[in-house]
Amino acid sequence: MIQLMLYSLIITTSIIFFNMIHPLALGLTLLIQTIFVCLLSGLMTKSFWYSYILFLIFLGGMLVLFIYVTSLASNEMFNLSIKLTLFSMFILFFMFILSMILDKTSITLFLMNNEMQSIIEMNSYFTENSLSLNKLYNFPTNFVTILLMNYLLITLIVVVKITKLFKGPIRMMS
């Protein structure tokens, strides 16, 4: 049921994204949609580790874009359209009602308060997560993990050496 709600939120933010004009509002909508996609991918893989890394990488890229947009965009305020707000609220309400109607098994499990089922599901999630992490750090793939760690360390050292701290900003002012 949560996945269905996240699908509806992703669709709603996509519709809102196409109706935005201001670059900062576009960036905020894109960031919110990224949060929803990371939550959905974490729920689907039953481990939030990969979605957390995806979110951090995307957030770093969004911060760079935010710096460029704020330096280039004009200082005009962006207005929220009442029509767009009502439309998005209607879509959210409709998707919520639709997910409640379509997902009758979740409602019956919730009403029956079946705690034993949730404990069994939790145990299967933990074993599945430990197996996926074992595959990542065991023999055939541990070389790839070590290679990626070394690549990131060397990239960090190169970036620090390229940007000289006392020489001023990287971008030349004209």
Curated annotation (Swiss-Prot):
Main localization (coarse): mitochondrion
EC category: translocase
Subcellular location: Mitochondrion membrane
Membrane topology listed for this record: Multi-pass membrane protein
Top-level division of the source organism's lineage: Eukaryota
Name recorded for this polypeptide: NADH-ubiquinone oxidoreductase chain 6
Gene Ontology MF terms in the entry: NADH dehydrogenase (ubiquinone) activity
Record-level GO cellular component terms: mitochondrial membrane; respiratory chain complex I
Signal peptide as annotated in the record: none
Function comment: Core subunit of the mitochondrial membrane respiratory chain NADH dehydrogenase (Complex I) that is believed to belong to the minimal assembly required for catalysis. Complex I functions in the transfer of electrons from NADH to the respiratory chain. The immediate electron acceptor for the enzyme is believed to be ubiquinone.
Transmembrane segments: 24-44, 53-73, 82-102, 143-163
EC numbers: 7.1.1.2
UniProt record similarity statement: Belongs to the complex I subunit 6 family.
Keyword field: Electron transport, Membrane, Mitochondrion, NAD, Respiratory chain, Translocase, Transmembrane, Transmembrane helix, Transport, Ubiquinone
Record's catalysed reaction(s): a ubiquinone + NADH + 5 H(+)(in) = a ubiquinol + NAD(+) + 4 H(+)(out)
Keyword Membrane: yes
A Pfam family assignment: Oxidored_q3
